[in-house]
């Protein structure tokens, strides 16, 4: 099972044969389908616009598809609207790709990179293997330097395989240690769950402000007993159509949704936040939930924020299991 928008691409884009169909990522959660159509109609005639929503709850998942009548208008929409700032989001506009086995599982996890390498450096290094759909270098928010970890999604799995064969164990210029290049984890495959543990144990200062680092002994492992007891698949983190749900425990009474947006937003696309409140006092009961569209971004948010201090509270952050928290 793929994560993010690729599941929907199978049903929404399978008949697309031209370059008129676009996918729009990182939309504001309160943006409507009509507003999506209106925005893209300013470029040219839109044949269809579809905002993808949670099939049960009905809320926006933060992305949609726009199909133009002409390929020229679609190309102009990408050059005009890609990177547009909408509310607190910067939208990404690109061609939608029909789902097929050829393009599945083409996402790489790279670690051990020199801290001086930028996103452009990483793309330049890997572009010889094929077309890069997107890339992300994880940056320490305090120092502004790379954390030596990156994700790259190729157009085809064969391109990703070639990159692994050529670069796994390779020493890039400026590095005294070999880098690790492998397929990014699919959390529905137990053999790949070690990635979360790797992310969790890595240096994890990602969020500035009132969050302060705590000693490792205070950290609550997202791979703890409650999660590992479900290794058969019952309680391991899995993604429903709504994305990857993260459980945050030990929030202060005054915590609100704005704090969660501020904390998790820097890691990637957040589609929903919820603080659980006491019915009588309307104060936070100490926990909340955040839903993110991308597994790697959710895993990194957990690795960075679990065990950190918010106010006078030490947060416990983990993937939500199938067990209900009351």
UniProtKB/Swiss-Prot annotation:
GO terms for cellular component: cytoplasm; cytoplasmic stress granule; cytoplasmic vesicle; cytosol; endoplasmic reticulum; glutamatergic synapse; nucleoplasm; nucleus. The modification N-acetylserine is found at residue 2. Pfam families: RRM_1 (PF00076). There is a cross-link at residue 191 (Glycyl lysine isopeptide (Lys-Gly) (interchain with G-Cter in SUMO2)). GO terms for molecular function: double-stranded RNA binding; lncRNA binding; miRNA binding; mRNA 3'-UTR AU-rich region binding; mRNA 3'-UTR binding; mRNA binding; protein homodimerization activity; protein kinase binding. The keyword Cell membrane does not apply. It is found in: Cytoplasm; Nucleus; Cytoplasm, Stress granule; Cytoplasm, P-body. Phosphorylated by MAPKAPK2. Phosphorylated by PRKCD. Methylated at Arg-217 by CARM1 in macrophages in response to LPS challenge. The modification Omega-N-methylarginine is found at residues 206, 217. Keywords: Acetylation, Cytoplasm, Isopeptide bond, Methylation, Nucleus, Phosphoprotein, Repeat, RNA-binding, Ubl conjugation. Residues 20-98, 106-186, 244-322 form the RRM domain. The modification Phosphoserine is found at residues 2, 100, 158, 197, 202, 221, 318. This is ELAV-like protein 1. The gene is Elavl1.
């Amino acid at each position: 099972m793929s994560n993010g928008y690729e599941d929907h691409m199978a049903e929404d884009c399978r008949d697309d044969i031209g370059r008129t169909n676009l996918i729009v990522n990182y939309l504001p959660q309160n943006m409507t389908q009509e507003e999506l159509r209106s925005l893209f109609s300013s470029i040219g005639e839109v044949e269809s616009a579809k905002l993808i929503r949670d099939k049960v709850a009905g809320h926006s998942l933060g992305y949609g598809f726009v199909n133009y009548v002409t390929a020229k208008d679609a190309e102009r929409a990408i050059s005009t609207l890609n990177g547009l700032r909408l509310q607190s989001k910067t939208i990404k506009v690109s061609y939608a790709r029909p789902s097929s086995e050829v393009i599945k599982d083409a996402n790489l996890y790279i670690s051990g990179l020199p801290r001086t390498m930028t996103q452009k450096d990483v793309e330049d290094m890997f572009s010889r293997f094929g077309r890069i759909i997107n890339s992300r270098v994880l940056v320490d928010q305090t120092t502004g330097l790379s954390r030596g970890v990156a994700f790259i999604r190729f157009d085809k799995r064969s391109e990703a395989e070639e990159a692994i064969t050529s670069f796994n164990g390779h020493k890039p210029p400026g590095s005294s240690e070999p880098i690790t290049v492998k397929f990014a984890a699919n959390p529905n495959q137990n053999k790949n769950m070690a990635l979360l543990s790797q992310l969790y144990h890595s240096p994890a200062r990602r969020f500035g402000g009132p969050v302060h680092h705590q000693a490792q002994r205070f950290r609550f492992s997202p791979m703890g007993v409650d999660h590992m007891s479900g290794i058969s698949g019952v309680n391991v983190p899995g993604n429903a159509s709504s994305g990857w749900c993260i459980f945050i425990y030990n929030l202060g009474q005054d915590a609100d949704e704005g704090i969660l947006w501020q904390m998790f937003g820097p890691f990637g696309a957040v589609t929903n936040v919820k603080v659980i409140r006491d019915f009588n006092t309307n104060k936070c009961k100490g926990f909340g939930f955040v839903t993110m569209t991308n597994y790697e971004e959710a895993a990194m948010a957990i690795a960075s924020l679990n065990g950190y201090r918010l106010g006078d509270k030490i947060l416990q952050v983990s993937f939500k299991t199938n067990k209900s928290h009351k």
